[in-house]
Amino acid sequence: MAGTDREKALDAALAQIERQFGKGAVMRMGDRTNEPIEVIPTGSTALDVALGVGGIPRGRVVEVYGPESSGKTTLTLHAVANAQKAGGQVAFVDAEHALDPEYAKKLGVDIDNLILSQPDNGEQALEIVDMLVRSGALDLIVIDSVAALVPRAEIEGEMGDSHVGLQARLMSQALRKITSALNQSKTTAIFINQLREKIGVMFGSPETTTGGRALKFYASVRLDIRRIETLKDGTDAVGNRTRVKVVKNKVAPPFKQAEFDILYGQGISREGGLIDMGVENGFVRKAGAWYTYEGDQLGQGKENARNFLKDNPDLANEIEKKIKQKLGVGVHPEESATEPGADAASAAPADAAPAVPAPTTAKATKSKAAAAKS
């Protein structure tokens, strides 16, 4: 077949596919508009930089896992607050039945407009997730946690019954269904996960996450969060130093790390992170115990400098913008003239995210094909 005949045959096939499955079902990559990746800021500048795109990517599956009390829910609630500040709709599926509304409020979450579900079993939870995602009205949905998505058969069965692989099959089926809908509706799904230990592992890490392997494959970003140090004020513990490793990243280079402070009752210390990154990148000068920025003293000791930036948010926004511009993350050239703090606009909701139809039955598919032929 000659080259022109092959091209004509391909064009005819593409036209037939578009007629049968709708416009955009197949296209040449050059015809697709190359839009920057939309993100939701995490609340930590260091983590936004480590992610490579300025935050958690929209329309993707994200897994956050780590030991108990490492900051998984805190990190996720900051993402929820940032999505809401940008005008987005957020749902929180609390399978653990452990969400503290007062703590969420302190972190900046608008609890009055947060859509909350506390399902009875794993099937119900994932069905709710599927329906909410297909509505096309959400910007972010959080599932806390995968380990708490207990299959109905396990709940209704006896305590000693064995249900090998039941939860893994449930997660695999759910992710197959929702991944496409997430991408079409630009909804981000954050799955919080717990750690377990494999028995009899002699070499390598014995740690593994719950829910089988499906989530590892479907997740575009996987974050391993660990508490590395306890922050103290005298003898009193006031927070934790936390390290997050980007174990998997499909939107930027992986294996980068970020460290930040989580203060009890306050969440991630954005100002503390800005001081650390400001010193690292040469914007904030540290001489002895004093921190200075462009000749102005921020304070003696990190705690005083942190409080100064907290009282002067415009200055904090200015330092953050300079750090992100230097590292080429999260700030686009056309945004350089916008007001401070406007980088969260990259998390703005899609104005007209289409509702994603539920999967059609084989019968409906045949009738559509017959209509296309006629």
Swiss-Prot record:
CDD domains: RecA. PROSITE patterns: RECA_1 (PS00321), RECA_2 (PS50162), RECA_3 (PS50163). ATP binds at G66, P67, E68, S69, S70, G71, K72, T73. One of its GO terms (biological process) is SOS response. It comes from the Bacteria. It is found in: Cytoplasm. Residues 327-374 are annotated as: Disordered. SMART domains: AAA (SM00382). The keyword Cytoplasm applies. The keyword Cell wall biogenesis/degradation does not apply. It holds the Pfam family RecA. Keywords: ATP-binding, Cytoplasm, DNA damage, DNA recombination, DNA repair, DNA-binding, Nucleotide-binding, SOS response. Residues 338-374 have a biased composition (Low complexity). GO terms for molecular function: ATP binding; ATP hydrolysis activity; ATP-dependent DNA damage sensor activity; damaged DNA binding; single-stranded DNA binding. One of its GO terms (cellular component) is cytosol. Belongs to the RecA family. Can catalyze the hydrolysis of ATP in the presence of single-stranded DNA, the ATP-dependent uptake of single-stranded DNA by duplex DNA, and the ATP-dependent hybridization of homologous single-stranded DNAs. It interacts with LexA causing its activation and leading to its autocatalytic cleavage. This is Protein RecA.
